[in-house]
């Protein structure tokens, strides 16, 4: 354990594009590493991605460890887990952070099992304990009703996954200098336990709500599946995405990958339009860091108005179509 040092971040990329969550985690790792007097190291796995290292350094990494191989062109569990494991075994990190995305949620447990260390999933807060210097990993428990803080005293590295949108990215500083280390991993055909025949992109490029700049979110007040059509129309006009509260998801009006809140995703878009959402504390926890919040609700006492920058008391069924027409008219000018 005394050999272990530095805070490592799995810098997720898809199709050669760095994902926002990796940049956010480097910002958080910077704070943790500064508390420990250590460095931030980003791990970049993929194919023809080495040129992305400078972006990671600009956002706060001191060093980038790159594994560039054709076997890593698309995310496949086995080759990625092997690369990650070899880096951890040769570099001995103190802490490793992953985004709680479909990739991170697949990779992190696999790696933690192989190197025999713990993993705390879906953390919403990370701190270094002043006395023990251990990583304090906080996450919602019991359906989001309490927050539990977990420590990994005996094993290294200390590992956690963190949802996109929870941590704040640092502004890019292009003048920052850093080191890039290229690591060779000897992959064999046996590592490729999956054959990718083709990658099919969906026609409507639905963006992960944590990546969207504008979100039009609906709650119980939307009323039904039909009601979400008005939200979708407005989101299309604004080049945004549709999101929802737990009530709307539980009612089956929209898929759960659109859920914002303590048991859903945490988002910080530039604009969050809350339609028929009462603003329960669990929902607010997932969106209160949005840059600008507009709330539309019939109930003028709704808690959502307490955190909204702009509030409209009224019926969304009447307001949304008019709002959509007005925005379209402005865009056409």
PLM regions with names:
Residues 1-333:
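N-terminal glycine-rich FAD/FM-binding segment characteristic of electron-transfer flavoproteins
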């Amino acid at each position: 354990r005394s050999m272990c040092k530095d805070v490592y971040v799995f810098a997720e990329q898809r199709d050669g594009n760095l994902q926002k969550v990796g940049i956010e985690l480097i910002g958080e790792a910077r704070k943790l590493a500064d508390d420990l007097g250590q460095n931030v190291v980003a791990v970049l796995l993929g194919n023809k991605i080495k040129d992305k290292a400078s972006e990671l350094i600009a956002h706060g990494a001191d060093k980038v460890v790159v594994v560039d191989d054709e076997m890593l062109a698309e995310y496949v569990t086995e080759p990625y887990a092997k690369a990650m494991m070899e880096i951890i075994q040769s570099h001995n990190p103190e802490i490793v952070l992953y985004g709680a995305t479909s990739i991170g949620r697949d990779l992190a447990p696999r790696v933690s099992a192989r190197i025999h260390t713990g993993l705390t999933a879906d953390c919403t807060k990370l701190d270094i304990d002043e006395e023990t210097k251990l990583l304090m990993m906080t996450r919602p428990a019991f359906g989001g009703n309490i927050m539990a803080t977990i420590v990994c005293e005996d094993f290294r590295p200390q590992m956690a996954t963190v949802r996109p949108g929870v941590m704040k990215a640092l502004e890019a500083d292009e003048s920052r200098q850093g080191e890039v280390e290229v690591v060779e991993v000897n992959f064999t055909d046996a590592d490729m336990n999956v054959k990718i025949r083709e990658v099919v992109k969906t026609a409507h490029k639905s963006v992960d709500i944590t990546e969207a700049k504008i979100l039009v979110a609906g709650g119980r007040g939307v009323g039904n599946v039909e009601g979400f059509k008005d939200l979708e129309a407005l989101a299309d006009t604004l080049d945004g995405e549709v999101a929802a509260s737990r009530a709307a998801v539980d009612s089956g009006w929209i898929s759960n990958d659109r859920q914002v809140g303590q048991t859903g995703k945490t988002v910080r878009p530039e604009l969050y339009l809350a339609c028929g959402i009462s603003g329960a504390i669990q929902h607010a926890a997932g969106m209160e860091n949005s840059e600008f919040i507009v709330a539309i609700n019939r109930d003028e006492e709704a808690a959502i108005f307490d955190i909204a920058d702009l509030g409209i008391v009224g019926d969304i069924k009447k307001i949304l179509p008019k709002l959509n027409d007005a925005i379209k008219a402005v865009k056409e000018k």
